[in-house]
């Protein structure tokens, strides 16, 4: 299979590029990206670095820009810090965490490989959407999993999911966008684990709210409100109104990312701007 060579990016002169992995509880934040009149994860990290003498650092860049309420289990990011920054790299996660609130944690830090860009070098993004499938809600999962009181047909949901995997036009499942809407969906799988269900979603890039629209549609299938075979027709229609509604953001987690050679076969055709696909 043919492959593209990875595109190379370098920090500005006088800066060292670091690669960090960060996790956060999205309930406290208006999303990843810094914005006025709201607390963001990006701004929270910058404040912690400034406390360590890193005022000259550029803004951190993440593999994906999550919306308000969305969590991250392992979000890669790069951070260009001045070469004069003196905190030893081995101590940086602990030092940052001492200044960060309990809802954000730096899990690891290293010097980024040459040419690494957290957003543009990313070849696969993984998400998990969590459901609490039980007659009664559970307080420990409030804002962390969607409560579904009725039974769900996992087998039907996975049949519908299989019909969506691959290179397709996903306009029917995403918030309306002006740019092209073809994406390569690498994984869509429902995994029940007792009352806690995980829906795994993976691809190089996603349209705005696409993951939440896919999950909302699978929920209709699981509830018997939509036939598994009907999902292919919804996909072909490109009509957002025919698919399920976006599920709430609190059940969505950015689970991880991969970096490697980007595939030519099955590419979304929009690999240059994966990080603009906010909200999932």
Curated annotation (Swiss-Prot):
A Pfam family that this protein carries is PseudoU_synth_1
Give binding positions for substrate.
Answer: 127
Gene Ontology terms, MF aspect: pseudouridine synthase activity; RNA binding; tRNA pseudouridine(38-40) synthase activity
Q: Which reaction does it catalyse?
A: uridine(38/39/40) in tRNA = pseudouridine(38/39/40) in tRNA
Q: Which UniProt keywords apply?
A: Isomerase, tRNA processing
Check the record and name the Gene3D superfamilies matching this protein.
Answer: Pseudouridine synthase I, catalytic domain, C-terminal subdomain, Pseudouridine synthase I, catalytic domain, N-terminal subdomain
Record InterPro entries: PsdUridine_synth_cat_dom_sf, PsdUridine_synth_TruA, PsdUridine_synth_TruA_a/b_dom, PsdUridine_synth_TruA_C, TruA/RsuA/RluB/E/F_N
One GO biological process this protein is involved in is: tRNA pseudouridine synthesis
Q: What is its EC number?
A: 5.4.99.12
Active-site residues (renumbered):
67
- Known partners and oligomeric status: Homodimer.
State the function annotated in the UniProt record.
Formation of pseudouridine at positions 38, 39 and 40 in the anticodon stem and loop of transfer RNAs.
Similarity comment: family membership: Belongs to the tRNA pseudouridine synthase TruA family.
Q: Under which name does UniProt file this protein?
A: tRNA pseudouridine synthase A
Species of the source: Deinococcus radiodurans (strain ATCC 13939 / DSM 20539 / JCM 16871 / CCUG 27074 / LMG 4051 / NBRC 15346 / NCIMB 9279 / VKM B-1422 / R1)
- In the UniProt record, the gene name given for this protein reads truA
């Amino acid at each position: 299979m043919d492959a593209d060579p990875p595109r190379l990016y370098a920090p500005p002169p006088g800066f060292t590029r670091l690669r960090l992995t960060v996790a956060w509880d999205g309930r406290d934040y208006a999303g990843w990206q810094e914005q006025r009149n709201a607390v963001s994860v990006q701004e929270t990290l910058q404040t912690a670095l400034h406390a360590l003498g890193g005022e000259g650092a550029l803004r951190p860049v993440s593999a994906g820009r999550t919306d308000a309420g969305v969590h991250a289990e392992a979000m890669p990011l790069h951070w260009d810090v001045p070469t004069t920054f003196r905190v030893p790299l081995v101590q940086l996660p602990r030092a940052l965490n001492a200044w960060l609130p309990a809802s954000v944690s730096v899990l690891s830090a290293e010097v980024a490989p040459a040419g690494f860009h957290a957003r543009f070098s990313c070849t696969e993004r993984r998400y998990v959407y969590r459901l609490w499938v039980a007659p009664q809600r559970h307080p420990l999962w409030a804002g962390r999993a969607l409560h579904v009181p009725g039974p769900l047909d996992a087998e039907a949901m996975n049949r519908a999911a299989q019909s969506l995997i691959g290179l397709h036009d996903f306009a029917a499942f995403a918030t309306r966008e002006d740019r092209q809407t073809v994406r390569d969906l690498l994984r869509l799988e429902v995994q029940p684990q007792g009352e806690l269900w995980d829906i795994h979603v993976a691809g190089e890039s996603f349209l705005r709210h696409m993951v939440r629209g896919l999950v909302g549609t699978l929920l209709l299938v699981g509830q018997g409100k939509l036939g598994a075979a009907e999902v292919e027709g919804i996909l072909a229609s490109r009509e957002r109104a025919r698919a399920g509604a976006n599920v709430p953001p609190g059940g969505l987690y950015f689970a991880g990312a991969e970096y490697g050679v980007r595939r030519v076969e099955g590419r979304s055709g929009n690999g240059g701007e994966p990080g603009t696909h906010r909200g999932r």
